[in-house]
């Protein structure tokens, strides 16, 4: 998988950057926190390190430094579509580079291969009380999928910290591949007839979600 190869080439650089930052600047204060901020939902507090996103107070969220309009404009799109491949956005998040169409399509193909949702997940959702909130059902389905986690399996078998990212990448791809099917089924369970609609292998991630939701694509 080219995505894994790409990450394998850049992860050591990120690790070295963090190592140097902690060693040389570990005692630098990054913020001061007031009681009002604590009671105000932690708003404005610098408490996380991330390269993926940042919320600009004037322009809104930025993904890898790009505004939403910039992101939508620069990502590869399916033919005759104004909306990019979701696989391209995923690639941008992980790698930090604008993907080629081939990069986006590789992610889309990985998702198609990993999209099967085990029957027990649907059974868990069907067994939940009527009136359960859709987000609770969504969370419950994701928790049920822990049984499928490659990271959990590898962790029990034993692996070094330098290897963590490999099964984490697999788990990330496996989970994101299944989310459209799970979300569409929850929508059907809550607001329609509760039937399950199989994904269409000819459609990309975003189009498949719309298809399973009953939206005309």
Where do the protein language model's features map onto the residues?
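Hydrophobic alpha-helical bundle cores within soluble ligand-binding/oligomerization subdomains
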Residues: 1-217
């Amino acid at each position: 998988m080219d995505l894994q190869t790409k990450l394998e080439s850049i992860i050591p650089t990120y690790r070295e950057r963090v190592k140097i930052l902690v060693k040389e600047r570990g005692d630098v204060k990054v913020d001061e926190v007031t009681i009002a901020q604590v009671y105000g939902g932690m708003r404005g507090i610098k408490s996380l390190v991330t390269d993926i996103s940042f919320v600009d107070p004037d322009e809104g969220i930025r993904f890898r430094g790009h505004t939403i309009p910039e992101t939508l404009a620069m990502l590869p799109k399916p033919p005759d579509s104004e909306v990019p491949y979701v696989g391209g956005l995923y690639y941008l998040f992980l790698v930090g580079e604008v993907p080629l169409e081939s990069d986006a399509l590789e992610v889309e193909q990985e998702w198609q291969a990993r999209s099967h949702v085990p029957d027990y997940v649907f059974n868990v959702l069907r067994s939940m009380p009527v009136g359960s909130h859709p987000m609770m059902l969504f969370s419950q389905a994701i928790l049920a999928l822990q049984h499928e986690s490659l990271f959990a399996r590898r962790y029990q078998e034993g692996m070094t910290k330098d290897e963590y990212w490999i099964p984490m990448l697999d788990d990330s791809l496996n989970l994101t591949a299944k989310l459209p099917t799970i979300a569409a089924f929850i929508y059907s369970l809550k607001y329609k007839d509760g039937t399950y609609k199989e994904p269409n292998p000819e459609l990309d991630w975003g189009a498949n979600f719309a298809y399973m939701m009953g939206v005309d694509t």
